[in-house]
């Protein structure tokens, strides 16, 4: 059975509280400025303690890119209910891209994205989902001289993720977001 979610809710939280959610938070704060004058603080502060007891798992692994002819780093967040043997349960996927000079762990360590996902899923604001943290090197996530990163993501990484994990393997089951260079890609 596939996870049911509204496209609006999934898009709102698509970047696990980063870019797109910042716009929503700031818009809400602008309507009620007395509540939160620094609506972007969550982007720059490491969240110390998760607000819920919900806990997904995170792994750092490699995928082989035929396009790039090399192994590439990625990290994955799996929801607490994830069972690789339960092919009937499919999850939407959030693809997250780091900024220039970084790597996929920046989205995890600097921004505490797994904690944000745990809080959003645990509170019911986001359906259970898989998050993939892409290492884009300094490619700006497009096909440039010497590194066809956009092609590698589209033709190699996404099919690899769909084959490896129980995903909603369609455009309706995917969203992509990032910060800085990752927002450009």
Feature locations, PLM:
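Non-catalytic cap/lid and distal C-terminal segments of serine-dependent acyl enzymes
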Residues: 12-22, 30-185
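Intrinsically disordered, low-complexity sequence elements enriched in Ser/Thr/Gly/Pro
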Residues: 5-6, 172
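Secretory targeting signals
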Residues: 1-5, 19
């Amino acid at each position: 059975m596939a996870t049911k979610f509204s496209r609006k809710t999934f898009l709102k939280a698509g970047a696990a509280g980063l870019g797109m959610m910042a716009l929503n938070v700031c818009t809400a704060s602008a309507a009620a400025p007395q509540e939160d004058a620094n609506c972007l603080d969550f982007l720059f502060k490491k969240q110390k303690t998760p607000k819920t007891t919900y806990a997904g798992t995170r792994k750092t692994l490699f995928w082989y890119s035929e396009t790039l002819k090399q192994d590439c780093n990625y990290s994955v967040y799996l929801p607490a209910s994830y069972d690789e043997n339960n092919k009937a349960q499919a999850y939407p996927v959030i693809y997250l891209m780091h900024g220039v000079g970084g790597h996929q762990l920046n989205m995890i360590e600097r921004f505490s994205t797994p904690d944000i996902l745990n809080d959003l899923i645990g509170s019911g604001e986001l359906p259970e989902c898989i998050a993939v943290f892409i290492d884009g090197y300094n490619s700006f996530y497009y096909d440039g001289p010497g590194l066809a990163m956009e092609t590698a993501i589209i033709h190699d990484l996404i099919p690899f993720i769909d084959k490896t994990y129980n995903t909603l393997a369609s455009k309706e089951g995917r969203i992509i977001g990032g910060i800085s260079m990752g927002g450009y890609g």
